[in-house]
Design a protein with these regions (language model features):
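Class II aminoacyl-tRNA synthetase catalytic cores and aaRS-like
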Residues: 1-201
């Protein structure tokens, strides 16, 4: 096996283990939820479809982990997470694959500030365990995870890094025009908020 490919496999395994180690230590419970579902919700994606012969029922492969995890929260499990495969029957490019591993977590009695704290600490924990430090080389840059993460709204981020102010964009047509100007691909179904999200990904 090519050494670089081997290193990627080893590093991925360490990352998954480190995520589990951190979340378990924070009181989260790892769960498994159904892959075959009657209603594939939780994301805007086209599902793969199949047929269950024993019940003569059409089923779908899940496109996200969200809905069953939220049911567990409502049922009284206050901190849950899942690392599992999801399937999306759509485009194929550098950011889209028909099947991929997704991690989702949910916890009760917190807000988005608590979730940001959790995310920031998770990244630091994984980086420290997997690489032995908090300074990560990325191309010509070094990402320093020891510093507090910038906390900024999506609108402010696009304005700061792409010089586009979505507060000044009044309607969908104007948003589409801005997207075309910046070579951001979008679909007919995308609304202004979707184009804002695509703009953030683009930068």
């Amino acid at each position: 096996m090519n050494q670089e490919v081997k290193d990627t496999f080893v590093k991925r395994s360490k990352i998954i283990s480190s995520i589990r180690h951190y979340l378990d230590g924070e009181g989260f419970m790892e769960v498994e939820t159904p892959m075959l579902v009657s209603n594939a919700g939780g994301a805007a994606a086209r599902p793969f479809e199949t047929h269950f012969n024993a019940l003569s029922e059409d089923l779908k492969l899940r496109i996200s982990l969200e809905l069953y995890l939220k049911r567990l929260i409502v049922g009284g499990l206050e901190r849950v997470y899942e690392i599992g495969r999801v399937f999306r029957n759509e485009g194929l490019d550098t950011r889209h694959n028909p099947e991929f591993t997704l991690m989702e977590l949910y916890q009760a009695y917190t807000d988005y500030h608590g979730m940001m704290d959790l995310t920031e600490n998770l990244y630091r924990h994984v980086a420290q365990e997997v690489t032995g430090g908090l300074q990560l080389p990325y191309g010509e840059h070094v990402i320093d995870l020891s510093k507090p993460f910038e906390r900024i709204t999506m609108v402010d981020a696009v304005k700061k890094y792409a010089n586009v102010d979505f507060n000044e964009i009044k309607d969908l047509e104007q948003a589409r025009a801005v997207a075309k100007e910046h070579h951001i691909e979008f679909e007919e179904r995308h609304k202004k908020g979707d184009i804002l999200n695509l703009s953030l990904i683009h930068i």
